[in-house]
């Protein structure tokens, strides 16, 4: 209730004052908020990092005016910088990957891309508006060389061949809304099945799932499909803490905060300071901090706080203060 009122007040302000309000609240409260669980007794803090690896797929029905080709190109460029730094520092992360990226190519049949796949019904949510055409209209039905924003087997190979043991998780096949409001059983089952099928040729059997747009739902379908852990928090105020076991047996790990910021006006030095606070408190409480991000973040953000926060994670681990784990590795805690 308090958070809802806060969000209503914040959204009514000009953007400059929204940012100042966020800074003020962070300063006067005990943020980042920690929720304890006596079932866990960790020896040190843990940092988990998950990447929503999507290229053009996440943005095609965005309500914002976005050049999806530009975003996909930036993500490809950033990918090499990010993976090189992760491997240099030996920081494993979870790459939550859209299933279509595993394809070398695809083609139209019966006049449609992926004609045998179930489609979402028209819908509108907080982020996307899909009101006309076919869900796969944007699919170029080419290949990773002609249309690198829609296919990425070359990048998948780089992840798999890294000296650091990264995890590849499922992020659906086509980045659709998994909420009960905007999906249906056959659609969800098809999205999960097709994503697994696209991963098969790489020998990947994912156990972790990240919801597209962080739009939660279809938990029983995920359990039935063999997933073991999801990025999800039932307690919206929890920023640091421990995994939860849902009623159907799925493990859920909260996300703490996103490492990419879309509001203009933030000072990147402030953001670096803020992200360090999350790590420091996770160390102090011997809890889990779970960062997530889009690899398409702006290059200035990448340089000024994203890569520096990776360096900070590395230094704190080298000092024996924390561990770095993937989502999959949390299952055995």
Model-inferred region functions:
Residues 256, 294-296:
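Short strand-loop junctions, especially beta-strand C-caps/beta-turns
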Residues 255-277:
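C-terminal amphipathic alpha-helical segment
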Residues 2-208, 213-251, 270-291, 298-333:
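Catalytic alpha-helical scaffold of carbohydrate-active enzymes acting on polysaccharides/glycoconjugates
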């Amino acid at each position: 209730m308090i958070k809802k009122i806060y969000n209503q007040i914040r959204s009514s302000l000009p953007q400059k004052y929204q940012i100042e309000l966020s800074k003020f609240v962070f300063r006067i409260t005990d943020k980042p908020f920690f929720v304890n669980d006596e079932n866990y007794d960790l020896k040190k803090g843990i940092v988990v990092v998950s990447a929503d690896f999507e290229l053009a797929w996440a943005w095609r029905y965005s309500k914002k005016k976005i050049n999806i080709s530009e975003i996909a190109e930036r993500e490809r460029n950033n990918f090499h910088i990010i993976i090189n730094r992760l491997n240099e520092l030996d920081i494993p992360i979870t790459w939550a990957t859209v299933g279509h990226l595993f394809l070398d190519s695809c083609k139209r049949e019966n006049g449609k891309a992926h004609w045998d796949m179930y489609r979402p019904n028209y819908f509108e949510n907080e982020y996307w508006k899909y009101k006309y055409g076919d869900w796969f209209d944007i699919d170029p039905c080419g290949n990773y060389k002609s249309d690198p924003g829609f296919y990425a087997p070359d990048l998948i190979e780089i992840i798999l061949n890294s000296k650091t043991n990264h995890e590849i998780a499922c992020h659906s096949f086509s980045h659709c809304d998994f909420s009960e409001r905007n999906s249906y059983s056959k659609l969800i089952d098809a999205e999960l099945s097709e994503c697994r099928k696209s991963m098969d040729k790489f020998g990947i059997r994912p156990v972790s799932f990240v919801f597209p747009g962080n739009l939660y739902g279809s938990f029983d379908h995920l359990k039935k499909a063999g997933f073991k852990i999801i990025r999800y928090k039932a307690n919206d105020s929890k920023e640091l803490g421990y995994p939860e076991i849902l009623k159907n047996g799925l493990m859920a790990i909260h996300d703490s905060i996103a490492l990419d910021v879309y509001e203009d006006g933030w000072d990147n030095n402030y953001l670096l300071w803020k992200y360090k606070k999350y790590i420091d408190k996770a160390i102090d409480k011997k809890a889990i901090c779970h960062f997530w991000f889009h690899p398409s973040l702006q290059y200035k953000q990448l340089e000024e706080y994203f890569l520096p926060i990776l360096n900070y994670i590395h230094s704190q681990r080298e000092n024996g203060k924390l561990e770095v784990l993937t989502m999959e590795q949390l299952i055995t805690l």
